[in-house]
Structure formats: C-alpha cells, structure tokens
Amino acid sequence: MAEAKKPGPERISILGEANIIVDHGLWLNFVVDDLLQNTPTSTYVLITDTNLFDTYVPAFQAQFEAAAEGKATRLLTYTIPPGEASKSRETKAEIEDWMLSQQCTRDTVIIALGGGVMGDMIGYVAATFMRGVRFVQVPTTLLAMVDSSIGGKTAIDTPMGKNLVGAFWQPKRIYIDLAFLETLPVREFINGMAEVVKTAAIWNETEFTVLEESAAHILECVRSKGEGRLTPIKDVLKRIVIGSAGVKAEVVSSDEREGGLRNLLNFGHSIGHAIEAILTPQLLHGEAVAIGMVKEAELARYLGVLRPGAVARLVKCIASYDLPTSIHDKRVVKLTAGKKCPVDVLLQKMGVDKKNDGQKKKIVLLSAIGKCHEPRASVVDDKTIRTILSPSIQVTPGVPSNLDVTVTPPGSKSISNRALVLAALGLGSCRIKNLLHSDDTEYMLSAIHQLGGASYSWQDAGEVLVVDGKGGNLQASKEALYLGNAGTASRFLTTVVALCSPSESASSTILTGNARMKVRPIGPLVDALRSNGVEIEYQGKENSLPLRVDAAGGLKGGVIELAATVSSQYVSSILMAAPYAKNPVTLRLVGGKPISQPYIDMTISMMASFGVHVTASSDEPNTYHIPQGQYQNPSEYIIESDASSATYPLAIAAITGTTCTIPNIGSKSLQGDARFAVDVLQPMGCTVNQSDYSTTVTGPAPGELKGLPHVDMEPMTDAFLTASVLAAVASGKTQITGIANQRVKECNRIAAMKDQLAKFGVQCNELDDGIEVLGKGQDGGISAPTVGIHCYDDHRVAMSFSVLAVASPSPVIVTERECVGKTWPGWWDILSQAFKVDMIGHEPDANADEEDSKSSVMERSVFIIGMRGAGKTTAGNWMAKMLGWKFIDLDQELERRAGCTIPEMIRGSRGWEGFRADELSLLKDVMAKNSHGHIFSCGGGLVETPEARQLLKDYGRNGGNVLLIHRDTEQVVEYLMRDKTRPAYTSEIREVYLRRKDFYQECSNLLYYSPHSESSGSKSEIPCDFQQFVSSISGRSTHLKDVMEKDHSFFVSLTVPDVSEAASLIPEVVVGSDAVELRVDLLQDRSVDSVTRQVSILRALAKKPIVFTLRTVSQGGKFPDEAYEEGLELYRLALRMGMEYVDVEMTLPENIIQTVTESRGHSRIIASHHDPQGTMSWKNASWIPFYNRALQFGDIIKLVGVARSSEDNFDLAKFKSRMQEAQKTPMIAMNMGKAGKLSRVLNKFLTPVSHPALPFKAAPGQMSAAEIRRGLALLGDLDPCNFYLFGKPISASRSPALHNTLFGQTGLPHQYHRLETDNIQDVREVLQAPDFGGASVTIPLKLDVMGQVDELSEAARTIGAVNTVVPIGKADASDRRRLLGDNTDWRGMVHALRDEGVEEQADSETKGAAMVVGSGGTTRAAIFALHSLGFGPIYIAARNQAKVDALAADFPAEYQLQGLSQPSDADKVSSNLNVVISTIPADRPIDPSLQELVGALLSRPAVGTERRVLLEMAYKPSHTPIMQLADEAGNWTTVPGLEVLASQGWYQFELWTGITPLYRDARSAVLGL
C-alpha cells in the first residue's frame, strides 16, 4: 500500500502570487531548498538579532552549506541588538556600510529573520540598497506573522514618530514557520494577539467569536512551561495565523499602496501609534494598538455608529488575552514608570499619521464586530477625539428647547449581576438580553469564568450573552479574583466561592480589589459565613477585602443569622448560594430593619425565575426559608434597564423643562429606584406619566422646581444623588433621609455631595442618615464652579453632576470621565446624541497631576516597641517634636487611667495577668481612637501577649508604622540594673531579651538602632542620625529633589570592611558628597545584627543619606550571585532602617525585585545594571532591555558599562540624552575603566566617587569628587566664580586663607579676594557681576549691604546685620541671580559653644541662663545665638542702660532679655548662669563698673554639673581682659574669638557651595596650622 503523502505547507496568495507560505517546521525543512530553487542569487544576507542568532542561525547555516555545495552562492550573516531602538537611521546605515564592505551587489537577497522591527527595517534596507534588492521575510513573532511581514510596508522610526521614513517594498517570499512561536516569550505572544483581534474585529465576526472562545485555552498553553507547550493549540494557532494573514493579503492585493481599503488594517493604530510614540520602547506595539482599539471603538460609539454592546465585547476580548485596555492599566503604568500621555501630544502625534488628509485626521470606525463603518478610514474632528482621549470633560450648559427624547438606559447593574450568578449556578443554557456592559459585570463575568462555573458566548452582534451553567460545579482558583471597585460582585462572590470544590492547584480563593475596595465593609457577611462553617481569612484590613475563602463545597446550612442594616447585598449573596448548602437554610436578618428591602425582594423574585422558590417565615419577621435545589436556567432572561441610571436622563428633563421617556421601566419594575419619578420628581413639580412598563417626565420651566421638605429615599438610596442635584436648583430646603448606607459605597457619597455642591454655592447639612440641601432656586440660582468637580471614581457622582452642569451658568468640568463605565459606559454619548449637550475633553494641569502623584508623607500613628531602657520614651519625644505630633507613653497612660503605678497593679489581686490584660485593652483603644498624628511608646513586655503581637502586625501590614527601638544589649542591661522605677525582672535580663527578640522583629516594620548610650548626649537635643531616620521613614526627606536640582551631585563609595574601625575616616571621606554608599558586599561580617550596627554607626558619623548596596560578583562586587535569601534579608533590613536609597540589581529574580520595591516605603530604589565585562555597547539597543526593566522598578536608574576608548563615552552621552528626553526618571550612566573617566565627569547626577583616604576604589576608573570638579572646570562645565570680603580694615583678615584653602581641597575653581572699602558704592558693581559667587561682609558695611540684596534670612532680619551675601536660584535673562543676605556670626558662636559641650536647653523651668557683655552690633548676633540654644533669661551687661533698654526692645518678649549696668545688678541674675559671650572691644580697658559686675558674676560658685563657658568674640589680643577675669574666677572654660571666625566662615562656605568641609580644615586655615 502506498504511503500517504504528507500535505504540503499552506500557501496564501498576495498580489497574484502565492508567496506567503505557512506551516510548522519550515525554517529547517523547507526554506533552504525553496530559496535556492525559487530565489537564486550569488549572495544571501541573513540578518537577525542577537537573541535569535544562536538558536536559529547555526543549524540553518549548516543546512545551507550542505545544500549549496558546488553552487556559486554564499550566505553572509549579521546581527543587531533586539528591540524598537534598533529601528533607526543609525542601524540602517551600519548594515548598509557592512554590506558594501562585503561587496554585496544588485543580485543580493536579504533575509530578515525576526519580529516586526527586523522586517520593517531590513525591508527598508532592501528597498534602498543598490536602489532595491530582493528580500525575504521570516517572521518569528506572532505579530510579524499576521501583520508586519505582509504587505510590503518597510520603515524606520524617527524622533517625530514611528515608521515615518520608509518605502513600499514587497518581499519575494514570506515564510511563516509556526514552530518559532514555541520559543516566543509570553508577553511577545500576547503582543501579537492584538493584531489578530484587530483583523477579526474589522473583517470577520465568526473568527472573532473563535478568538473569544479560545482565549482561556490559548493563554493557558502560552503560559505553561516546557517543550511542546503550544502542541494542544497547534490547529487553533494555524487557523488564527492563516485567517489573519489571509485577510491582510486580500486587503493588500486590493489596495497595495493604501489608497483606502488598506486603511482598515490600521484600526486601533491611529490612536495606538500616538500612544506608542510616547511610551515606546517600554510599551510594545500590540499593547499600544490594544489600547488604541478600545479608544477608537469608544469614538465610534460616541459618534453613534457602534452599539455599546459591541464596544464591551471588543474590550472583553482584548482583556481576555491579557492585553491592556487603558493607558491607566496597572501594568502599563508600571512598565512606563507612570509616564503621562498628554492629549495635546497625542493629537500632535496623530497629526503626522500617513492616513490623514492634510489637517483632517482619519480613523477607522467600526459599525459592528467584523464590520467597518466605511470601506476606508473616516474623517473625525479634533474636538471629538479630544473628548474620548481626555480624563475629564467640560460640559456646556443648555439643551435645545422643546426637546422630547426617548432614552433606553443599559441593563440594571443589580439585575445583571444577579442574573450572571444565577445562570452560572444554574444548569443549562440561558440567553441573557440587555445585560449591562460595564466594569462591574465584566469583573463578575471574568470571576465566574475563572472559577469554571460557566462558559459563555455572544450572539446577535454582542447584544445577547449565552451562558452555559454547570449547575454549581465550581473550582477554587489559584489566581486571585480581582474585582476593582465592584462592590456588588465582591459581596455576591464571597458566598459563591464558598461553594467551590478544591482544585488541583488551589484549596481556597482570594478575592481582592482596588484601594477603595479594601476599605469597603464586608464584615457582617463574613461573620455570617464563618458561623456557618466557612473558613474565611482577612488578608489585610479587618472587615474588608482582600479575603481568602476556603473551598468549602457549600455552606453547612441550617439557621444563618445576618446583620442586614448596612447592605442588602449581604442578604442577596447568601440567598442566591443557599440552595447549594448541605442542608436547607433558614436566613434570619438581625440587628434592626433591613436596608433596601426592595433589593431583597428582587433577588427572591429572580430566584423564582430560575426555579428556586424562597418563602418568608409566617411567624418570624425578616426570616426566609430557602430549600435545597439546583437552579434550572430559563431559555431566555431579559434584564430590564437600570432604574438608578434612568434617574439621570429623567433629571435632565426635570432640570431643563424638557421631556424624556424611559420605554422599559414602569410601575411593575423589580427595582426600587423605579419609584423615583413618582415619589421625587412629581412632588418637585414635574409632570410624570408612568405605566406598567414605561415612564415619561416633563420638567417645569427652568428655575421652577420645588424643594421637598422631607423625602425618605430608603427604598431607592442610590438615587439620592440625583435628587440632591435637583434640590440644589429647587426653591426651598430639601431633606433626604434613609440613606445612611451611602456613606460606605464607592465613596462617602453624602460627604461627596455636600463638598461638591458647595462648589456651586449650595449649602448642605449632613444628617445622621441623610442630607439637607438648601436650594438656590429663589436666590438667583447656583453659581458656576471655579474648579473641576471631583468624582471620587464614583459613577453616580459623575453622572449626577453632569445633570447639574446642564443647568450651570457656565461650563463645568467633571473629572474622572471614565468612571461612568461602571454602570453606563455610553452616558456621555447619550448626553451628546440624545440631549444635544455640547461637550469637549479637558485635561487637568500637568503640574496638578504631579502634585497629586507625590507619595504621601506619614500620617498614621507610630507605635514604638523595644526593651525597657532602649530609649523608647526619649526617641518618642524626639519624633513627636519633629513631626509636630502628640507623644503618649502607654505605661504612663495606663497608670493615669488606673490611678496607681504599674508595680502597684502587679502587686494587686489581678497580678501580672491583669496588668497584661489592661495593657492590651489600652493598645486596642488607642489604635481605634488615635490612629493618626500620635507617637505611642509601648511597654517592653507588650509583645509577650499573643493578641497584642497580632494587633501590631496587622497595624503594620495595613499601612501603620511599628518602630522597634534598640541599642547595644550590654548598655540596656547596665541601665536596667540601675532602674528602680519599674518591676524587677524575674529572670535574667539577657534571657528576657532573647525571648522577645523575634517577637520585636515580627511585630515591627521599622527599626532604629541607636548608636548613642543612655548617658550620652542631651535628651532634649535630637541627634542628627535620628533626624535623618525620621525624615526618611516619614516621607519628609527632600534629598532626591534637592540633588536633582543641583548641577552636580555625588555619593562616595565606602570600601571599608568595618565601618566602626574606619570611624575616624568617615567624616573626611564624605566631604563634598551628597550621600554615602555602604557597600554591604565588602563588609567582613554581613550578618543582620552586624550590618544593623554598621548602618547605625555610619549614619551617626557621616550625617548623610545612605545608599545601601549589595553588589553581586557578576556585577563587579563580592556578594555571591545566588545567595538570594541572604540578600533579601539584608534588603528587608535596609528598608526597615529607612535607608534613603537602596540599590537593587535588575538581574535579580523577579520575586526579590518585586518584594523589595513593593515594601520600600519611602526609600528610593536605584535600579542598577553593571556590565563589568564590557559585552554591551551604548551605540546600539543592547542596553534598552535593562533600561526598560530599571524604569519599571526604579526611582533612579543606574547603568554602568566599560569604555574601551573615548568614543564609548560619547555614545553613552547620546544614549543618556535620548532616554532623558523620553523619561523623567533620573539616571546615573557611566563607563568603568581609565577610558571611562570622562563619563564620570559628564554624569553630573549622583556620580559614585572615591576618596584618597579610602583603602581602594569601588570600581575601575573611579575618581574623587574633587578630581571630577577639576575636570568639569577644565571642560568649561563648572564656571570659576569670584568671592569677596567687603569692609575696612581687612588686610589682616584670615578669611581669604580659609576660603581659598577650602576651594582648593574640594576641587572648585573659585577665588576669594579682599575688597577693602568703607563705601557701599564700591561693591555694587561686584554684586551684579555674572561671575559673583558670594561675599563676606564686615564692618562698617554690615548694615549698608542690607539695601543691596533681594531678600534677607530670618537671622539677618532679627540681628539687623548681614555678614554673608549668597546668590540664589538660576540666573535671569540678564545673567543676574537673586541675592540673599544672611548672618552666620550667630552660627559660628553656636558651633564654638557646642564644641565646648554646651547643649541645647530643654524647654523647662530648669533651663540655663546666659549673658552677653556689650551692646553693639555683635551683641545682637550673640543674643540670637543664645536664644537658638534655648537659654533664658538672657542678660545684657553694658555700661549704658539706655542702649541696653533700646536693644532689648528690638527683640520679642520670648527672648527674656534683662539689662545689667551696675555692680549691684548682679543680685538680679539667676544662679544657673552657665554661658557668657563677650562682644566688647579687647584693645581698650573695660569700664570699671562693668568689669566689677562681670567679675562678680564670673566668680560665683558653679551650680550643678553643667559646664560654664565664656566665649570671647575679640581675637586680638589672643588673651583678653574678660578671658583673664574668667581664668581668675576659675571653673570657666574660655573660647577665643578665632574659633568663631573659623566656624562662621565654615558656614559661609557651605551656603555658597553646598559642600560641608571638615571643620578642622577650616580651623587650621584660620589659625595657620
């Protein structure tokens, strides 16, 4: 018997030739022979990308060489980097130059192996090389197979947009080998499905239906692992590809050069390409087209040429392939780092579309699934496009007079959701008509499908949904059911998933939603189900989603008690699932009168339609008996229109005096809201005609609506928003009650109406269960809002205010336009088409958007835990002081409430157990009542109580902050041994700590490890490291913003094995840097405890933000590449300790990157990639994948390559420039190696630097910050500035020595000069010079110069003198910068005093007193300095009492100034005088009476242990008479004036340059050391 011949490949004809060949296995089994036979040449050039070469080219080469043996032909190969970035003029030129170097001629055949990028660009090379050579397409992606490889369009991208330079150049062959799809990444496969969906949507509804039905199976196979993953869908894929390719071939054959018909293939592309042009390369072509299809379908619906059901069907199909349907899709936002697509830019991009007719934009409009409105793209005006693209809409008031319209609202949301649940639980097929096509029902439909509860298909152009129910046979889902903000779906499905049986992959199902859903209540339903044996676990906030529901296989049944006063949906949820319980159910509603009884009645009525009859108890109120059974699906179920939605068109009629008819809602409706016309509109003055099945309303003349003294809207609570906007324009007061449940809907709707109506000048009062609206009908009417109406992402708020906008005096902006999609996606279309309302899209100000998107600062209260003696109370007080919050020590609060001490409580009858119970009760109380704006210090043993631990863990998980305070255990032990104020430990202290250590860890999400001992420092003075920590964790740090605004910024990379051993180096090496990098991978000990200590020490020493880096071996570091668990533990530590920056390598596993980025709090992620081997080039697209990945996860992107030559640095600069033009995310990009030094000089933003004092450099070619500044100066990138000292006499001043020394040390090219003058006119020209960098000012110009500056600091204003001039901000058009006058004398004094141990005084009765000697200009600075340290009173000792009194009068009373002029005044001085500052000249004798007064005060015996310090402001002679008096008195430390000169100049340098040098260097320069 003859062997059956295997069928050959499928051939598709295009332009009269069968040149498209489709099959599995073509590449190695067919292509070589076919090429040699049908496309012979002397030279084949195979061009592919670096990703594909190794997999597909070597085997092909071997086959080719074997087949071509003896023939005069050769095969050349060339690779380019993958990705859209390669589709450029530069890459095209690179290929052409290479081909010329290979002596390719006119007979060359080019083979493009790859995706759309490869085919587009290589086709263009073929079209222009030697004026056109033959080429062959071998598409390897689904998108290329069905779209870009067919039709001869070739092009490259330009900065203006995609594919704008190219040619029509038909390939000689297109080999579509479906085997390539086996290795195609999941995202690329899904990307291609967009073009498949597009082709079916414009051409063939039958194929579209196949796509709908195949989506789940296709995705399951595509996402599976292993060889042969696509085998189960082999035939489906072949059908899809042949179908799509065939359509395109047919269209191209009819219209090769895109004269009209071929336009249709661009459905979704007009808007999609514009989106792609902005979001490329992070967003793929198919993803952009998917979004474009949705928008263009919405456009067709808005224009009235496409029915809403078709739009919903298209959106559902696109989403079913996991493609995005909106630019706000979470994945799109993440991939593109939230990059905006401004409407004006989108329209500009659309303006260069090749389909356009001059200025007229042409867009493909669908008229149905599988059919287009015209056989070409249609002209659409910009105003309409803008409306569809904009996030907000501007509604112009007014409708035509005598309007009489009929409006059919979408299907009822309430009935639609119930029908879907009942049909899915029922057995058999059910045709559901008039189903609401909305976000809510889409979530419900997707969830039921995910649970395997039913299959479904669309009929009658998407107007009928056919549900095939499986009789309640549901399976638990491994993937969470995401329900957005669909409250109805969440409540119904909570009970439905309890009916699930365990599946192979899951024994429970998680229900989750968006942020609002996670605060909406569901507690009563969960309580009822738990009481009936269903295991449900809250995954986040108690009483809200997300929930984990056990696959219980049904309820136990019997009696179920349910609180139904919040939502009737809880009742309906249990009612609908009850027939599948293991026993008959009696549902008893408790807690008071059930809310929204009509909706409960609706559910019972619908259950009867599906074959299950519920009976109300005859002897118990609010009790129902539900039998066991199985729903039997009716063959057809028609959903009546949504009565809540119907209130909006009826209200427009009411408010405008026109007529509107709703043809399918009348008095026999199942819905309570159907009564709105009769119960609300009629009493307000409307004419209402309601039959059994229709409602017609005619409004009174505009302005004649009457308010309702009282209306109970409990039967129709959702309609209260519509009533409220009508009440706003009515005369008199309207009181609406019975709507308490509206506070827990999509938003607090009562508060929302009150706040938004206020924008129209309407006053409202909130009631316990309602709202009171004071109508403006008799007061001249409502006023027009000056700002947009905020809709809270709530469909009913948006639609209600669109009604009011029609009656506004001027246009009204309604924000969040798309939120109406929840129940009436086509609402704006109805306003435009039926009511003829004029509207246009509106885009909020971009800056306002940016403000909204900023991460919020910490608002939730902080609970501090840790061992007694760790410093919780001290840290709590510090934190409260910094944040302006209230501090409460819970131990003290417990004692206050109990009226006895803790030791007394423990010794009492209830003992430790009673104490712990009261402690727990207090914790619960403050968590509930004081969840914001408080700092609580908890008792050390609180964590011993399991329930307390759970409370703390839950609090931390739900956005709260639990801070663990710890310090060296030995210090804690030593302190506790001395503390007698608390109960003694019954077990050894260390054992207690070790027992609690893990508890502290698990309960806290923040950690502060104090490097300060209990005895060190002032408890009133907040240490710098703690300030830095709180600033970071609270979101108040502006460091990133500050360094982004600087021209040049740096972080120094520490390369020390132990920070504590290098403690003396740290202050020196951080000079000139903006942050310090802790290379954790270089530490000797990387244990969590050790790293905790190292971070703590570094923060205290460096006083700079920390970059926490764990560099792996493969990225040039020392951390093991695959030590993932150890690495994750260290990353978690970094986040707990509030590291300002955490470096995360983009080569780490996805789960680690996700974990770190999602729990980062306010830490900034530096998403990094290093190429220490130098395998990648900045010239091509090889860095793009790493850039894109870093963009997804990073606040900062860091890319580091290797330079082989200087050219590599220029290539890098071009790459960086292109990326920064496209994205705002800041970027560090450099090359390693000697040749890469230039890139470090040019980087500018947070450049990693070394320091000569460090043991070695962190990377090859690393430079110091000073070296880079010198390099910048040589390149002309850092302009030299001139700084001056103004005054007279100044020839002996040490200021030039100070500043020029510091300029030299920090690498700055500036010079500091003396300008000796006593005339202010001499300095004016200098102050205006473009190269003026700053000035020091001394006598006699400190007052005169105040008139020459633009603004004064608070210190300069208070002191009344300027000693420092600082240019601020950017130069204006005349190259002049604004000048700030400041005074650093006081800061110099404070520094000198602090250096001698003077601490900030606690704000208490015990704070120290201080004295200033003298009454001149310097005295004022001394007073300011002492006040800043908290001293009070401050005495002024001077010989002239009148001058003293005048001086004191210039300062606020809070300074507590008191004058002393006679020796007898010494008796007025308090005994705790600890600080004296002398401001009198030292080169002349002291006034005798003043000397006697000062001598008497200095000679007093010391009180307490505080240090006594005398600061002498004069520095000639070196030992002054006042200093001599102090020496003679004894017990005084004297500080000479040169110390102040050094420190005030040190502060000046910091103000001018932003660099804080070492004080010892400034001091040495002044003292000439």
Curated annotation (Swiss-Prot):
Catalyzed chemical reaction(s): 7-phospho-2-dehydro-3-deoxy-D-arabino-heptonate = 3-dehydroquinate + phosphate; 3-dehydroquinate = 3-dehydroshikimate + H2O; shikimate + NADP(+) = 3-dehydroshikimate + NADPH + H(+); shikimate + ATP = 3-phosphoshikimate + ADP + H(+)
SUPFAM superfamilies the UniProt entry points to: Aldolase, Aminoacid dehydrogenase-like, N-terminal domain, Dehydroquinate synthase-like, EPT/RTPC-like, NAD(P)-binding Rossmann-fold domains, P-loop containing nucleoside triphosphate hydrolases
GO CC annotation, single: cytoplasm
The protein's Enzyme Commission number: 4.2.3.4, 2.5.1.19, 2.7.1.71, 4.2.1.10
Cofactor(s) essential for the protein: Zn(2+)
Stretch list, region EPSP synthase: 395-837
An MF annotation (GO) of this entry: 3-phosphoshikimate 1-carboxyvinyltransferase activity
Residues involved in 7-phospho-2-dehydro-3-deoxy-D-arabino-heptonate binding: 131, 147, 153, 163, 195-198, 248, 262-266, 269, 285, 354
GO process annotations (BP): amino acid biosynthetic process; aromatic amino acid family biosynthetic process; chorismate biosynthetic process
Subcellular localization(s) per the UniProt record: Cytoplasm
Residue numbers binding Zn(2+): 195, 269, 285
Region annotated 3-dehydroquinase, chain positions: 1054-1267
Gene3D superfamilies linked to this entry: 3.40.50.1970, Aldolase class I (3.20.20.70), Dehydroquinate synthase-like - alpha domain (1.20.1090.10), Enolpyruvate transferase domain (3.65.10.10), Leucine Dehydrogenase, chain A, domain 1 (3.40.50.10860), NAD(P)-binding Rossmann-like Domain (3.40.50.720), P-loop containing nucleotide triphosphate hydrolases (3.40.50.300)
Cofactor annotation comment: Binds 2 Zn(2+) ions per subunit.
Span list, region 3-dehydroquinate synthase: 1-382
Protein's job: The AROM polypeptide catalyzes 5 consecutive enzymatic reactions in prechorismate polyaromatic amino acid biosynthesis.
Subunit structure of this chain's protein: Homodimer.
HAMAP family according to UniProt: EPSP_synth, Pentafunct_AroM, Shikimate_kinase
Family of this protein: In the N-terminal section; belongs to the sugar phosphate cyclases superfamily. Dehydroquinate synthase family.
Record NCBIfam families: aroA (TIGR01356), aroB (TIGR01357), aroD (TIGR01093), Shik-DH-AROM (TIGR01809)
Entry protein name: Pentafunctional AROM polypeptide
